[in-house]
């Protein structure tokens, strides 16, 4: 009886463990793999400008909350529908900074807290 309890416990532990994505490094990933890493509602983009400064708030200069956040600008969408690009390496198609951006615009105005963070660095998702 104890054997079955141990086997059931180990099976439950393995099933509840985090899912590990088997993506290669950012230098070896294809555009299709990058598109899969971005998921549904996001698209692979190539951004020319990245700002790595923390955003300020009422508690000091960011208080360490957003220190690892990068803001992307001057981004252009990579077309994944073209077969030649989908099979090519991402670093050949995007010489700048690859990011996953939301399909909606990154505009946030007129609210109490105006935050528009539509892009996430691809390297943080793989």
From Swiss-Prot:
A GO MF label: structural constituent of cell wall
Disruption phenotype: Does not affect pathogenicity in a corn seedling infection assay nor the production of microconidia, but affects microconidial chain formation.
Keywords: Cell wall, Disulfide bond, Secreted, Signal, Sporulation
GO cellular component: extracellular region; fungal-type cell wall
Signal peptide annotation: 1-16
Expression induction or repression: Expression is positively regulated by the cAMP-protein kinase A (PKA) pathway and more specifically by the adenylate cyclase FAC1. In contrast, deletion of PKA catalytitic subunit CPK1 has no obvious effect on the expression of HYD1.
Disulfide pairings: 38-100, 46-94, 47-75, 101-119
Similarity field: Belongs to the fungal hydrophobin family.
Role according to the record: Aerial growth, conidiation, and dispersal of filamentous fungi in the environment rely upon a capability of their secreting small amphipathic proteins called hydrophobins (HPBs) with low sequence identity. Class I can self-assemble into an outermost layer of rodlet bundles on aerial cell surfaces, conferring cellular hydrophobicity that supports fungal growth, development and dispersal; whereas Class II form highly ordered films at water-air interfaces through intermolecular interactions but contribute nothing to the rodlet structure.
Protein's recorded name: Class I hydrophobin 1
Native source organism of the sequence: Gibberella moniliformis
Underlying gene: HYD1
């Amino acid at each position: 009886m104890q054997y079955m309890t141990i086997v059931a416990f180990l099976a439950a532990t393995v099933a509840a463990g985090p899912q590990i994505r088997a993506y290669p490094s950012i230098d070896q990933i294809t555009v299709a793999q990058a598109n899969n890493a971005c998921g549904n509602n996001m698209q692979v983009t190539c951004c020319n400008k990245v700002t790595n400064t923390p955003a300020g708030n009422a508690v000091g200069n960011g208080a360490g909350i957003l220190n690892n956040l990068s803001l992307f600008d001057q981004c252009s969408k990579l077309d994944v529908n073209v077969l030649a690009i989908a099979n090519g390496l991402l670093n050949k198609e995007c010489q700048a900074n690859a990011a996953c951006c939301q399909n909606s615009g990154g505009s946030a105005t007129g609210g109490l807290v105006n935050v528009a963070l539509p892009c996430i660095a691809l390297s943080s998702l793989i």
